[in-house]
């Protein structure tokens, strides 16, 4: 088969599969919760694939493939799918479509920039420059969960939040990157709680 196969890319493949599966299931069942749940799982996978990759002995081709497949998966899971999900479930006015398009452009600019600037994913970093694209899913999901509890004008809130998140993707703000084990455990627990809240509220 084409491609490269190791533990790190298995995680990337699984995340992309789950995100796409949840997205299509949300359309089939007309329930946005499945799309957000799939993208949350993909975000957790994205958090771990680089960590696993740094502990593997890989050829230069495998390293390059890992960088490219991770970037392509990010485009699908955290840029295209969120925009299409929010469009399908309410952001359909012309200015909202423009906002979603802006979000997509900001996301691909960010990923292309870091593909050039940081082509070696084995290199550990202490901070992020700008908001990483997987974090957008956590923000969008949190807004949706709060809407279930408070019941505000969700379309209006996303109209404000989406462009802010998009611009944060290409901003130069520095966000500390936590790498200790307890942080990863906490993020996984929060992801599980978030998915449960999506379906319970």
Residue ranges and their predicted role:
Residues 51-59, 108-123, 167-177:
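C-terminal ends of transmembrane helices
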Residues 9-13, 55-111:
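Multi-pass membrane catalytic core of lipid/isoprenoid biosynthesis enzymes
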């Amino acid at each position: 088969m084409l491609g490269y196969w190791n533990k790190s890319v298995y995680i990337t493949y699984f995340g992309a599969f789950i995100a796409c599966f949840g997205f299509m299931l949300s359309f089939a069942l007309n329930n946005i919760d499945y799309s957000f749940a799939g993208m949350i799982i993909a975000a957790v996978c994205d958090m771990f694939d680089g960590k696993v990759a740094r502990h593997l002995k890989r050829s230069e081709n495998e390293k390059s493939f890992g960088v490219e497949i991770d970037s392509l998966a990010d485009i699908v899971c955290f840029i295209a799918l969120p925009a299409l999900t929010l469009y399908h479930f309410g952001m359909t006015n012309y200015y909202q479509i423009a906002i979603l398009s802006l979000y997509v452009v900001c996301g691909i600019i960010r990923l292309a920039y870091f593909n050039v600037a940081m082509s070696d994913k084995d290199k550990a970093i202490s901070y992020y420059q700008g908001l990483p694209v997987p974090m957008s899913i956590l923000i969008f999901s949190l807004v949706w969960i709060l809407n279930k509890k408070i019941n505000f004008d969700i379309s209006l809130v996303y109209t404000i939040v989406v462009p802010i998140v998009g611009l944060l993707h290409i901003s130069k703000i520095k966000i500390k990157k936590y790498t200790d084990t307890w942080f990863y455990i906490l993020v996984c627990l929060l992801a599980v709680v978030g998915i449960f809240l999506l379906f319970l509220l």
